[in-house]
Regions:
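Peripheral, non-AAA+ core regions of ATP-driven protein-machinery
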Residues: 1-281, 396, 538, 555-579
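Walker A/P-loop
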Residues: 283-322
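The Walker A (P-loop) glycine that initiates the GxxxxGKT/S ATP-binding motif of P-loop NTPases
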Residues: 285, 350, 372
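Short glycine-rich substrate-engagement loop in P-loop NTPases that contacts/grips substrate
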Residues: 339-360
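Basic, amphipathic alpha-helical bundle interface domains used for macromolecular binding and assembly
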Residues: 40-45, 60, 67-77, 354-355, ...
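Walker B catalytic acidic pair
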Residues: 365, 371-372
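Short beta-strand elements
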Residues: 18-24, 348, 454-458
Length: 579
């Protein structure tokens, strides 16, 4: 007897459809799973056997072969349990499922038959939707997440016995059991019967032809001795909430307002520019000047994710097993990731035999914050160079090459020197570092990486006697309004191009939309010679100037915009030793 169900697995962060083929044949009772399964999948044979028997069904006393197709793709995880169990029950004639060809099945089985949620449901269901599937059967714990994909009917299962339906006839074993408080535990009288059935299922006593399910003989399949239950899923239909939080709701970071930050008006200006064009930014200053505090407020001035971006980000978090509160809908706030400086390179960009998403992919469409950047291992920082340039992470393994999205804004902070007090301006906090030690400290961040950071901003220590430093200045709402207006201009300008922000301009599009004009070009070329700027720095200054012009509502870049952009290249200047 042959049957086929449909499931899915993760391959990187993408869902891949997997056919679960079940074959029952005469022979020694055993279950064999083939198709490059990992250990968790091979162990499914024991989980499914126990779950099927403990819920009143009969496990076939035949040679059970389960093939996961395509067979040349390595499969991982426990998401195939439900499809394997339903495949065995339908192939053995205990259930009939007319909609099996258009229903995706995902879920891990416990030994008592209950369903446990699995990770990566969202990309799996998206793959099924693209393949033409109409419904998904999965654990109730994943139902809210599954409902985020439109066009798919979601059926939520708490327990394998729920597949019988409220009016389906029970099997002979189920008739001899007493369900107490919703459990599948047998009574004392039924215990011996269940034990005998278990022995039969293991091939210890009964013969093959006495089984209550169809078996193939020389004259063809026989009729089942027990009632066949038609599997109707309507009683399992999941109804999603009528509405989810609006995309226009303020981000979590808006609870902490920039109006709380006294002074530092030029830093707020730099952060506004960075957010408007999604430019990389590095804040440099002594301890206690508010670098970390201001960057942590940065998500509050960024517009919420669009519907397309929200689905993209939510799928990445689902694949990484980090999707929380799926009942609230798609992730609408831009991600803000802040890994510790002890993180490894694999943790930052992703790793594993089948790589999982790293921090740069989890920060996709949002912000990756590296606090105290020089404390990160240099080799770890260097892995950022490719994703900062290409906006993707490419990881090569023996079996395949994986490409993950990594379109994020890099925000960093650092002290100006090893002791941290260079330029503090306080007589009791004088820098004790020599010029060579300052240079050695700053060299922990390589020149090519600094080249990819558009804004390098000094954050001085506020002076108590400076009235301007004690004023609150712009609030988060005001900065957010300016950023939204600038990004709206960019969206209109690049509506026919595969880019969203000024920071993504390159080549001919950069020359077209960020033309500095004759006067601006002369200014830039003179600075290229005096400061030794690279052509990459030249291009990034143009991108920054374009964003400054957008914030001013200007159609063309002026020399004033270029001059302001040049002020944010502080690390291009040599450090000065305090006397």
């Amino acid at each position: 007897m042959y049957g086929k169900m449909h499931s899915a697995c993760l391959y990187g962060i993408e869902g891949v459809m997997i056919g679960v083929e079940v074959d029952l044949a005469n022979g020694l009772p055993q279950t064999c799973i083939i198709g490059l399964p990992d250990s968790a999948i091979r162990e499914a044979a024991l989980r499914v056997r126990s779950a099927v028997r403990n819920c009143g069904f009969r496990y076939p006393q035949q040679r059970v072969t389960i093939n996961l197709a395509p067979a040349d793709l390595r499969k991982e995880g426990s998401a195939f349990d439900l499809a394997i169990a339903v495949g065995i029950l339908t192939t053995s004639g205990q259930l009939v499922m007319p909609s099996a060809g258009t229903t995706l099945m995902i879920g891990e089985l416990a030994l008592d038959g209950s369903l446990r949620p699995v990770t990566g449901v969202l990309p799996m269901i998206e793959a099924a939707r693209k393949a033409g599937f109409k419904a998904v059967l999965l654990p109730r714990g994943n139902a809210a997440e599954a409902a985020l994909i439109g066009g798919m009917q979601v059926y939520a299962v708490d327990h394998l016995r729920d597949l019988r339906g409220p009016e389906s006839p029970a099997s002979p074993i189920a008739n001899r059991t007493e369900e107490r408080s919703g459990s599948c535990e047998p009574t004392e009288a039924a215990g011996s019967a269940a034990s005998q059935a278990a022995d039969d299922a293991d091939g210890l006593d009964a013969g093959i032809n006495g089984l209550p399910f169809p078996v193939t003989t020389s004259s063809g399949p026989t009729s089942p001795a027990q009632p066949v239950m038609a599997l109707s899923l309507e009683h399992l239909r999941y109804t999603a909430p009528a509405s989810f939080p609006s995309a226009s709701e303020p981000a979590e970071a808006m609870r902490e307002d920039y109006s709380d930050v006294l002074g530092q008006h030029h830093v707020k200006r730099a952060l506004t520019i960075a957010a408007a064009g999604m430019h990389n930014i590095l804040l440099i200053g002594p301890p206690g000047t508010g670098k970390t505090m201001m960057i942590k407020r940065l998500p509050g001035i960024l517009p919420s994710l669009t519907d397309t971006e929200a689905l993209e980000v939510t799928q990445i978090f689902s694949a990484a097993g980090k999707l929380k509160n799926a009942h609230r809908g798609l992730i609408r706030e831009r991600p803000f990731r802040s890994p510790h400086h002890t993180i490894s390179g694999a943790g930052l960009i992703g790793g594993g035999s089948v790589p999982k998403p790293g921090e740069v992919s989890l920060a996709h469409r949002g912000i990756l914050f590296l606090d105290e950047m020089p404390e990160f291992t240099r080799s770890v920082l260097e892995v950022l160079r490719q994703p900062l340039e290409d906006h993707v992470v490419t990881l090569s393994r023996a079996r395949a090459t994986f490409t993950y999205p990594a379109r994020f804004m890099l925000a960093g902070s650092m002290n100006p020197c090893h002791c941290g007090f260079l330029g503090s301006g306080h007589p009791q906090q004088r820098c004790t570092c020599s010029a060579s030690r300052i240079a050695q400290y700053r060299s922990r961040i390589s020149g090519p990486l600094l080249d990819r950071i558009d804004l390098q901003v000094d954050v001085p220590r506020p002076r108590e006697w400076d009235a301007n430093a004690q004023s609150a200045g712009l609030s988060t709402a005001e900065m957010r309004s300016s950023v939204a207006a600038a990004q709206a201009l960019q969206a209109e300008r690049y509506r026919d191009l595969p880019i969203s922000w000024n920071s993504e301009l390159y080549g001919t599009t950069l020359r077209r939309y960020a033309d500095p004009g004759p006067e601006g070009a002369r200014m830039l070329h003179s600075l290229l010679e005096s400061l030794g700027l690279s052509m990459r720095s030249y291009d990034r200054i143009l991108k920054l100037s374009r964003t400054i012009a957008d914030l001013e509502g200007a159609d063309r870049i002026s020399s004033a915009h270029i001059a302001e952009a040049l002020q944010y290249r502080n690390l291009d200047k040599p450090p000065m030793e305090e006397g």
